[in-house]
């Protein structure tokens, strides 16, 4: 049981890359700043995860629905019928990856935030062993920042292009494998349209991926803790609906 006389340390050691300004900051202020960053970024990460899960499931349902629709309601004499059934089945196979990746590889900061809440609860808001509390918070934040940097880095864009390129290649290959010119053109049309949509959605998913901890961590290391708030513009997937949300935060 913690005693009310437990007090915060005046100052705590500086993490690697930290400035002298950070070292002179009160332990309590450092804890509060890190805690606020965990909380705000966890909220965004959760919304991002479920928004893109919803977008992915909508895309999957659309592809499956079109395949079923062409199979059930379009006359077999229609030269586009088989091409659209095949292409939508292929697109469905690619679409199933997105929503489950959003869940399996959800940003770690979403689960780290509750762990920090529990840590602060167990230590009286960080007063008991404040420097150890800060060290643990910094450890988790550094890991989450590294993850965010990877998730928005160039490699993710390469993966996006490769994945969409594979989809385009498979659909275009179907066009090369048919002798019916109408069916071949339908395959080509589907290759172009689905690849463009896939690339746009994938890039938007990367560009809206949680990255706020990166800037917050750099400001923390630099000891820039001015109470003055600045405006920040961001684009995010809408939570609970298809579309994008443009927002300005202060």
Q: What is the meaning of each model-derived region?
A:
Residues 79-94, 183-197:
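Hydrophobic alpha-helical transmembrane segments
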Residues 55-62, 91-95, 158-166:
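Mid-membrane cores of alpha-helical transmembrane segments in multi-pass membrane proteins
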Residues 67-77, 171-180:
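Juxtamembrane "helix-exit" motif on the non-cytosolic side of transmembrane helices
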Residues 41-76, 83-87:
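N-terminal Sec/ER secretory leader and immediately downstream segment
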Residues 66-71, 82, 86-108:
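Glycine- and aromatic-enriched membrane insertion/assembly motifs of diderm outer-membrane
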């Amino acid at each position: 049981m913690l005693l009310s006389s437990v007090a915060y340390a005046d100052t705590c050691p500086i993490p690697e890359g930290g400035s002298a300004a950070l070292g002179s900051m009160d332990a309590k202020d450092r804890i509060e700043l890190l805690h606020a960053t965990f909380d705000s970024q966890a909220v965004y990460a959760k919304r991002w995860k479920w928004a893109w899960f919803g977008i992915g499931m909508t895309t999957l349902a659309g592809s499956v629905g079109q395949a079923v629709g062409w199979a059930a309601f379009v006359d077999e004499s229609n030269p586009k019928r088989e091409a659209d059934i095949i292409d939508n089945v292929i697109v469905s196979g690619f679409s199933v990856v997105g929503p489950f990746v959003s869940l399996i590889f959800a940003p770690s900061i979403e689960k780290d935030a509750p762990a920090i809440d529990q840590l602060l609860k167990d230590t009286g808001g960080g007063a008991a062993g404040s420097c150890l509390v800060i060290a643990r918070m910094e450890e988790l934040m550094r890991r989450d920042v590294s993850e965010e940097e990877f998730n928005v880095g160039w490699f993710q864009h390469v993966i996006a292009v490769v994945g969409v390129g594979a989809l385009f290649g498979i659909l275009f290959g179907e066009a090369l494998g048919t002798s019916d010119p109408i069916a071949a053109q339908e395959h080509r049309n589907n290759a172009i349209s689905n690849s463009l949509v896939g690339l746009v959605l994938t890039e938007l998913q990367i560009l809206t991926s949680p990255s706020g901890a990166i800037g917050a961590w750099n400001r923390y290391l630099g000891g820039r803790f001015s109470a003055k708030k600045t405006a920040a513009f961001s684009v995010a997937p809408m939570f609970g609906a298809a579309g994008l949300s443009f927002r300005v935060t202060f």
